[in-house]
UniProtKB/Swiss-Prot annotation:
It is a multi-pass membrane protein. Residues 1-63, 130, 177-189 are cytoplasmic. This is Tumor protein p53-inducible protein 11. It comes from Pongo abelii. The chain crosses the membrane at residues 64-84, 109-129, 131-151, 156-176. The modification Phosphoserine is found at S14. Residues 85-108, 152-155 are extracellular. It is found in: Membrane. GO terms for cellular component: membrane. Keywords: Membrane, Phosphoprotein, Transmembrane, Transmembrane helix.
Amino acid sequence: MAAKQPPPLMKKHSQTDLVSRLKTRKILGVGGEDDDGEVHRSKISQVLGNEIKFTIREPLGLRVWQFLSAVLFSGIAIMALAFPDQLYDAVFDGAQVTSKTPIRLYGGALLSISLIMWNALYTAEKVIIRWTLLTEACYFGVQFLVVTATLAETGLMSLGILLLLVSRLLFVVISIYYYYQVGRRPKKA
């Protein structure tokens, strides 16, 4: 009696098997959308970040605004550190400075924020740009409130202070505008 030989094994070609291909794609994370609506090519690009779509579609004027903000923060910081009397005089029109230390500390804080602004200018990461814009909007908003409260206490009013308040409100609006533009989901084509 001859032993029956088993039938030859058939290789399963996963490339031709639709269910297997779908399972493989799901495991690899290929072609799926994340919470931001971005399609990633692989799990590696999910881990490393995929900002290619954003670099193609930046809000108009964002980099110019980031540059102007960094220059503004740096300039005021250097002025507060080097010339505290002149900065105080420019804002509060001739009021006498009682101590230079708080103004210099303010300059140091602004210099730290300006370093963040300069670094955000060279990144394409949405999250970093949005946090920088939010920091900027909060800073200008707090500065507006502090100057307004100081005006209410002292009763000093001048053209310089009014220009400062109007400019701070404008800067808050611009920063919040870009904050929402950067965070906006791309339109489906």
